[in-house]
Swiss-Prot record:
One of the record's GO cellular component terms: cytosolic small ribosomal subunit
Example GO biological process: translation
GO MF annotation: an example: structural constituent of ribosome
Keyword Transport part of the UniProt annotation: no
Keyword Mitochondrion: no
HAMAP family recorded: Ribosomal_eS28
Keywords from the named record: Ribonucleoprotein, Ribosomal protein
Gene that specifies this protein: rps28e
InterPro entries: NA-bd_OB-fold (IPR012340), Ribosomal_eS28 (IPR000289), Ribosomal_eS28_CS (IPR028626)
Name of the molecule in the record: Small ribosomal subunit protein eS28
Source organism of the structure: Hyperthermus butylicus (strain DSM 5456 / JCM 9403 / PLM1-5)
Family statement drawn from the similarity comment of this UniProt entry: Belongs to the eukaryotic ribosomal protein eS28 family.
């Protein structure tokens, strides 16, 4: 691997992995403060992988979020009673 590519990879590992929001699934949390979204990882070893994650704060389709890791996925939202 070239010096430049290796340096870029180290920066991505330190800061996080950028991912694009491709679908908003719904709200979760006691007060609805967390939004469950599907994201596509843009960089790193899992590039192109689609994950379900919980995001705190306002988010729209097409937004870029930074994931600290790409291993975990959020559980699916349950149906309300």
């Amino acid at each position: 691997m070239s010096q430049r590519k290796e340096k870029e990879f180290n920066i991505i590992e330190e800061i996080g992995y950028p991912a694009e929001v491709i679908q908003i699934i719904g709200r979760t949390g006691v007060h609805g403060e967390v939004i469950q979204v599907r994201v596509r990882v843009l960089e790193g070893r899992d590039k192109g992988r689609v994950l379900t994650r919980n995001v705190l704060g306002p988010v729209r389709l097409g937004d870029i979020v930074i994931l600290r890791e790409t291993e975990r996925e959020a559980r699916r939202l349950g149906r309300r009673r």
